[in-house]
Amino acid sequence: MDSSTVGAPGSSLHGVTGREPAFAFSTEVGGEDAAAASKFDLPVDSEHKAKTIRLLSFANPHMRTFHLSWISFFSCFVSTFAAAPLVPIIRDNLNLTKADIGNAGVASVSGSIFSRLAMGAICDMLGPRYGCAFLIMLAAPTVFCMSLIDSAAGYIAVRFLIGFSLATFVSCQYWMSTMFNSKIIGLVNGLAAGWGNMGGGATQLIMPLVYDVIRKCGATPFTAWRLAYFVPGTLHVVMGVLVLTLGQDLPDGNLRSLQKKGDVNRDSFSRVLWYAVTNYRTWIFVLLYGYSMGVELTTDNVIAEYFYDRFDLDLRVAGIIAASFGMANIVARPTGGLLSDLGARYFGMRARLWNIWILQTAGGAFCLLLGRASTLPTSVVCMVLFSFCAQAACGAIFGVIPFVSRRSLGIISGMTGAGGNFGAGLTQLLFFTSSRYSTGTGLEYMGIMIMACTLPVVLVHFPQWGSMFLPPNAGAEEEHYYGSEWSEQEKSKGLHGASLKFAENSRSERGRRNVINAAAAAATPPNNSPEHA
């Protein structure tokens, strides 16, 4: 058996024996793979995932998928939070109480708890293109229906239904994980999700601007806010059509076509679900994301009204300040992903985990300070720092998610995303729905919960890479970790081939420092003397 064969003696030492470049093994292609790789505009690895990202390119399939993914997610964020900057007008029109506004905020993020769970399964079984396109277009009628409501119950119900569209986050992250190499996945996931989340800030600017334009055309305030909803509704329709016609599930084609050709195996949903829910790391990341992305969604719902009421600001000024919270995503979330990738390059997976803890704990501290701030400048500074750290933590979390499981990636992404929405709904219900707490006090308590709920990250341990405080298990290898998700019968049929390829490409998570140390240890001769000396 040749030592280059996966599973052969010495195969786990590739990159540390001195015979192979330590970081080349995960991305080199040759022979038939090299011929197949030549059809792509970007350099690719053995799975045909892009090894670089070129933001100004629309090359098919990698960069076209990237842009379709983040723009579709962006449009869903715009529509879901379009009501937030217009609440002072809507509440007067519909006679909404504080409880009604709080319940609507909970509803807007609760709907996607279910849709994100479903989207994870859809991505695994049908592919992200169908999931993304159909959800966006199915949500479009509910966005248009916002212009027809005339009661608090209708307002809450429609915001609940629009919130289902936030499940495009799952298809976005899944899509990026199938298109880009593991060495840059933190940055790519951060860019796609961060630019999509930016819609929560952009809508704070877009909707008041559209409202003002319609008002200047002669419409009454109570008519203008309704007509403004035609902008996000139209955006849904356009993006749904573009994703369906221009998108592609995998680097080599669409999932259904590849399955018919026999290039991709059809998986069992029950087994995919089983390996997702029985992996304890999944549940820790559900909690972590609940108090990173979750608090971001909660803040999107309350921040404009908070500044409007507490500091007696003009609606437009409050909207601009609130917009800066969501707009920070353009740099914050990608920065979190980039820090995750850079740390992993030298220290491996352990650096990714430390990155999550540092960023999310800092975000909780700044959230607490935001609630205690008594002046406008101090509040704005604390809000910006809280925003940056919380959103960077989101990027850092999805720098790790692709490594939790290869087989159940879609469902784990969906569960983690749903955790974000569950955390948002729970936090809004606890601190921002009743009159028991002021919004400032609610922000203080939310900051404390963020810091407390970040602590379980210390329990995340990968046998082959270790955890925050513990080294990797002796003899643990990537092939065994990802291969353990397949039964011996499935392995005999070769169904685990994609997992083995991913395992090979994920060896970079050992970190350059660990690889150097392993190579040094392998090169050191035994420190003993012959018995006859």
From Swiss-Prot:
The chain crosses the membrane at residues 70-90, 101-122, 133-153, 160-180, 190-210, 227-247, 283-303, 319-339, 351-371, 384-404, 411-431, 442-462. Induction: Circadian-regulation with a peak in the middle of the morning. Induced by nitrate and sucrose in roots. Down-regulated by ammonium, glutamine, asparagine and aspartate in roots. One of its GO terms (cellular component) is plasma membrane. One of its GO terms (molecular function) is nitrate transmembrane transporter activity. Its main location: membrane. It is found in: Cell membrane. This is High-affinity nitrate transporter 2.1. The gene is NRT2.1.
